């Protein structure tokens, strides 16, 4: 069961979703890719224009989070499980010594 802010945000994304349900996965995946590109675009402008685009990057990352959260909901994946799975995957790519050092730091 999802609780706390994760449940609140997932419910928010359900109630604010406005797209054709019959092609939900396709719409969400394309939206996620588009928003990730907008994060990259904001960063590119930061470099090119020598300005701080942190606020724009935060806004675009929020859109990425919205799409990612909707995809987690559609695939019945808890965001916390996604995080744990990703940690495990990344630790498995480390040498045993690196993984041990990481665990001891954390």
Residue ranges and their predicted role:
Residues 1-106:
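Flexible "arm" and connector segments at domain edges
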């Amino acid at each position: 069961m999802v609780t706390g802010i994760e449940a609140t945000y997932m419910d928010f994304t359900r109630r604010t979703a406005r797209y054709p349900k019959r092609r939900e996965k396709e719409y969400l995946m394309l939206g996620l890719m588009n928003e990730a590109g907008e994060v990259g675009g904001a960063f590119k402008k930061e470099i090119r224009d020598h300005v701080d685009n942190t606020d724009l990057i935060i806004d675009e990352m929020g859109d990425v989070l919205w799409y990612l959260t909707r995809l987690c909901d559609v695939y019945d994946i808890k965001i916390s499980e996604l995080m744990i799975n990703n940690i495990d995957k990344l630790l498995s790519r480390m040498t045993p010594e690196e993984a041990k050092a990481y665990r001891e730091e954390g």
